[in-house]
Curated annotation (Swiss-Prot):
This is ATP synthase subunit alpha. One of its GO terms (biological process) is proton motive force-driven ATP synthesis. Disulfide bonds: none annotated. Its main location: membrane. Produces ATP from ADP in the presence of a proton gradient across the membrane. The alpha chain is a regulatory subunit. Its EC number is 7.1.2.2. It comes from Thermotoga maritima (strain ATCC 43589 / DSM 3109 / JCM 10099 / NBRC 100826 / MSB8). PROSITE patterns: ATPASE_ALPHA_BETA (PS00152). It is a peripheral membrane protein.
Length: 503
């Protein structure tokens, strides 16, 4: 049999002409550009915004971020160095989910829920999408239970309730993280599960925080979510949503959870980086137009659920860093307007030795007051007034030579109360102890003491109360109010102690 080469060529040409390439452009695509943690892909015609995609050759995941006419912008969740032009991307037809549940307690994970602590895999039984719609008004109930921070200045004048969103704001190195960590340590035995989300921080700083939480036994009920400064912007962007989903698991199963976002300034910077790389139009301070929505959809998920949904709560403590005390910058004003109050820390107070450096005049809690225990309300009302008057007179007193006795008494009281509000780091105080020491302050029992003796008085007085008058502390703890009977006992106890206290 003779083979005619011309005939074979003709057949091949016809076959090639009639060949139709069946590429599935609906569920797959090809990478046309990659770099700086983002990729652009051709195809993926049916992909939805925020949908999870996978780079087939490397197994790395990404999120569809920009849907454009001729391509899809993808943020890469992990190492992008091995992804090359021409690689295949496929839809996964779901959004990012993270493992949730008790299995994560005591663990350090990345924003995808993968362990970073070398303690083996996390065998979680439950998963939750990182983005959900915040529950509406009818699914919520008013904030009515206190979340004790153990910090006198906060629990007395800026009280936080379970289900509240309270912003901690201030310049760098003013003690913002310290307040959040103290609050987590103080939840020991309170039935509150804690999630600490570290965004864009140095790994050494995060390691120090984890070490402190371990040291004080707080890791038993805490999960740490880490997206450090060396992680891609994409992971820093999803970190708070992942932490929120982990906290929501407890809230929706009728328990109480606390999430600390440390900090949302770096979160906004990571989102700005991704948006600019994706060529989204920049707005004020080069942030994209939807930067407000970025934080509002996160913080609206803090909730106090009604009894029908189990009555659980998710409390949020976002942290925002200011530059040179400027709380009127873009991100600070955004987050202030979203949250239910703010704790404002001032470098001036910090360097003057007033720690925690809380500016009580500019700090406010818009809903926590209704969650405060009655005993604390009874002493805190006077405290707030005394300090407000002291702040007014303080500047005036520096210039005035002669002061009338009433003004002098007000300044003396204010100085002692400011001293009383100082507190060591990592030493949160139970609410009943706070009530008795603040009672001594606002009722003038410290007015005749030198300012430098106030801290020693507080320490020895509490020891005396535990040794001789534990019944008063127990009474405040159980009844949650200062009855006239308890008040009389407390006055007698303070007077008794003052006879033995030597200056």
């Amino acid at each position: 049999m003779r083979i005619n080469p011309g005939e074979i060529t003709k057949v091949l040409e016809e076959k090639i002409k009639s060949f139709e390439e069946k590429i599935d452009l609906e569920d797959t695509g090809k990478v046309i550009q990659v770099g700086d943690g983002i990729a652009r892909a051709y195809g993926l015609n049916k992909v939805m915004v925020s949908e999870l995609v996978e780079f087939v050759e490397t197994g790395v995941k990404g999120v569809a971020f920009n849907l454009e006419e001729d391509n899809v912008g993808i943020i890469i969740l992990g190492e992008y160095k091995d992804i090359k032009e021409g690689h295949t991307v496929r839809r996964l037809k779901r959004i990012i989910e993270v493992p949730v549940g008790e299995e994560l307690l005591g663990r350090v994970v990345n924003p995808l829920g993968e362990p970073l602590d070398g303690k083996g895999p996390i065998n979680a039984k439950n998963f939750r999408p990182i983005e959900i719609k915040a529950p509406g008004v009818i699914y919520r109930k008013p904030v009515d239970t206190p979340l004790q921070t153990g910090i006198k200045a906060i629990d007395s004048m800026i009280p936080i309730g379970r289900g509240q969103r309270e912003l901690i704001i201030g310049d760098r190195q003013t003690g913002k993280t310290a307040i959040a960590i103290d609050t987590i340590i103080n939840q020991k035995g309170q039935g509150v599960y804690c999630i600490y989300v570290a965004i864009g921080q140095k790994k050494s700083a995060i390691a120090r925080i984890i070490d402190k939480l371990r040291q004080y036994g707080a890791m038993e009920y805490t999960t740490v979510v880490v997206a450090s400064a060396s992680d891609p912007a994409s992971l820093q962007y999803i970190a708070p949503y992942a932490g929120c989903a982990m906290g929501e698991y407890f809230a929706y199963s009728g328990r109480d959870a606390l999430v600390v976002y440390d900090d949302l300034s770096k979160h906004a910077v990571a989102y700005r980086q991704l948006s600019l790389l994706m060529r989204r139009p920049p707005g004020r301070e080069a942030y994209p137009g939807d930067i407000f929505y970025l934080h509002s959809r996160l913080l609206e998920r803090a909730v106090r659920l009604n009894d029908k949904l189990g009555g659980g709560s998710l409390t949020a403590l976002p942290i925002v860093e200011t530059q040179a005390n400027d709380i009127s910058a873009y991100i600070p004003t955004n987050v202030i307007s979203i949250t239910d109050g703010q704790i404002y820390l001032e470098p001036g107070l910090f360097y003057a030795g007033q720690r925690p450096a809380i500016n009580v005049g500019l700090s406010v809690s818009r809903v926590g007051g209704s969650a405060q225990i009655k005993a604390m309300k009874q002493v805190a009302g006077m405290l707030r007034i005394d300090l407000a008057q002291y702040r007014e007179l303080e500047t005036f007193a520096q210039f005035a030579t002669e002061l009338d006795p009433a003004t002098r008494a007000q300044i003396i009281r204010g100085q002692r109360l400011m001293e009383l509000l100082k507190q060591e780091q990592y030493s949160p105080m139970p609410v009943e102890e706070q009530v008795v020491v603040l009672f001594a302050g606002v009722r003038g029992y410290l007015d005749d003491l030198p300012v430098e003796e106030v801290r020693r008085f507080e320490k020895e007085f509490l020891r005396f109360m535990h040794e001789k008058h534990q019944d008063i502390l127990d009474d405040i703890k159980t009844k949650k109010e200062l009855t006239s009977e308890t008040e009389e006992k407390l006055k007698k106890a303070i007077e008794e102690f003052k006879t033995t206290f030597r200056v």
